[in-house]
A protein has these predicted regions:
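Conserved alpha-helix/loop element of class I SAM-dependent methyltransferases that forms part
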Residues: 2-19
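A conserved beta-strand element that flanks and buttresses the S-adenosyl-L-methionine
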Residues: 92
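A short glycine-rich, Lys/Arg-flanked "PGG" loop and its adjoining helix->strand segment in the class I
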Residues: 104-116
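Conserved beta-strand signature within the Rossmann-like core of class I S-adenosyl-L-methionine
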Residues: 118-124
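C-terminal alpha-helical "lid/dimerization" subdomain adjacent to the S-adenosyl-L-methionine
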Residues: 125-191, 199-200
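Core SAM-dependent methyltransferase catalytic element
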Residues: 193-216
């Protein structure tokens, strides 16, 4: 969908990526963000995802594009990351960490894995799904987002995209593997982990999508 493409483009734009940077792409999926980083400048990427299928598809792309020296894939959930301290210049996660229920330990691990001055760049949905599942105010808050996304899904992808978004929307409402928080909450999580500077960038034309850059 157009919104996700633009979201990933904004992540790369505000990341401050430089030549020869070491990057960790969390929740890499089929590699769209990793490949965008490489089109921006020469860098080395470690890409992780909990899905064996996503990693397999991305690995096929890497081999087809002759990028085995530039991208290394690992099948690993964000909660189980085990990298050396001060290893990466940039750690990115786009529409991935809202699947993590207990976010603080993951953010602290990200902080520890970054070099001094390194950046954590997160692209996410600005939606707060915390609270009691049966709380009316919480439900209305989530529906404000879902109404726009359902319309956008139908417009950009037709009935099939609408059905996928409808099913996903129920997961957001019930916190069924989806645990979104708002960007004020993301900012607090980053500051509590030790990040010195936190900036949030809106995605023009898509009020629910934003990008946060936290600098160590």
């Amino acid at each position: 969908m157009c919104s996700l493409f633009l979201h990933k483009s904004l992540v790369v734009k505000v990341s401050g990526i430089k030549r020869n940077d070491q990057i960790l792409d969390i929740g890499c999926g089929t590699g769209l963000l990793s490949l965008k980083f490489l089109t921006k400048t020469d860098c080395t990427i470690t890409a992780i995802d909990s899905s064996t299928q996503m990693i397999r598809i991305f690995q096929e792309k890497i081999e087809k594009c002759n990028l085995t020296k530039k991208i290394h894939c690992v099948q690993q959930p964000a909660e189980d990351m085990d990298f050396k301290p001060d290893q990466f210049d940039i750690i990115s996660a786009t529409v991935a960490l809202h699947h993590v229920e207990n976010k603080q330990p993951v953010i602290k691990n990200i902080y520890d894995c970054l070099k001094g001055g390194g950046r954590f760049v997160i692209g996410e949905i600005d939606m707060d799904t915390t609270g009691r599942l049966d709380a009316p105010k919480r439900l209305l808050r989530i529906l404000d987002y879902l109404k726009q996304e359902l319309v956008l899904a139908m417009k950009e992808g037709g009935v099939q995209a609408f059905e996928r978004m409808y099913d996903n929307g129920k997961k957001h409402i019930l916190n069924d593997g989806e645990y979104c928080v708002g960007f004020s909450q993301w900012a607090k999580l980053c500051r509590d982990a030790g990040f010195k500077n936190v900036e949030v960038y809106p995605l023009k034309g898509f009020e629910w999508f934003k990008v946060l850059v936290a600098t160590k």
